[in-house]
Amino acid sequence: MKKIGIVGSRSRDSEKDFKICEVKFREIYEEGDEIVSGGCPRGGDRFAERLAKKRGIPIKIYFPDWSLGKNAGFIRNTFIAQDADELISVVAEDRTGGTEDTISKFLSRVNDESKSHLV
């Protein structure tokens, strides 16, 4: 059993983007795997929740604790990066912000680019 992190830019929130994410998810998912994500209502986080519901897969959501201030999202990203065994990232063209932060933290931990899937 592995944990698949699914994250992504809020700007990539179309049905087409969901289908792209779903195809990659099906490629790496094995029976018993779980999903981890960040609870944003748009983009990759929303796709994670849709996939979990659609397939009856357990999901762990790391919501940001905004009482910690403006860095709460980046702190939350650390938890996702630490928990995931593989990471699907629905990236925006500019490749900045929280999604890129999660990718960087994940790759620093696993040191294996084949576990990071950019879609």
Describe the predicted segments one by one:
Residues 8-119:
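Acidic/glycine-enriched connector segments
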Residues 1-4:
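Extreme N-terminal starter segment of soluble prokaryotic enzymes
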